A protein has these predicted regions:
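Viral virion structural and adsorption modules
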Residues: 1-72
Length: 72
């Protein structure tokens, strides 16, 4: 069953004047994904998990990011 991205709500974001920009989304169940927008390379990549959003948000600049179809 595909994920319903409408279930994810924007929770955190970084300053959009700094590259890259990170956007953190969470469901009420605690599932999450972080979108990394790199304006220099004009790319968007994603990291996702089922728990530990706060920890991963804190490590957002150190975790691995992938194409959306690889993580969601």
């Amino acid at each position: 069953m595909p994920l319903k991205l409408d279930d994810y709500k924007l929770s955190d974001w970084t300053d959009d004047s700094i590259n890259p920009v990170y956007l953190g989304y969470v469901t009420i169940e605690g599932h999450w994904y972080i979108k990394k927008i790199d304006n220099s390379s004009r790319t968007m990549r994603y990291a996702a998990g089922l728990s530990e959003y706060t920890t991963n948000w804190g490590l957002k600049d150190k975790i691995d990011y992938f194409y959306i179809h690889e993580v969601l």
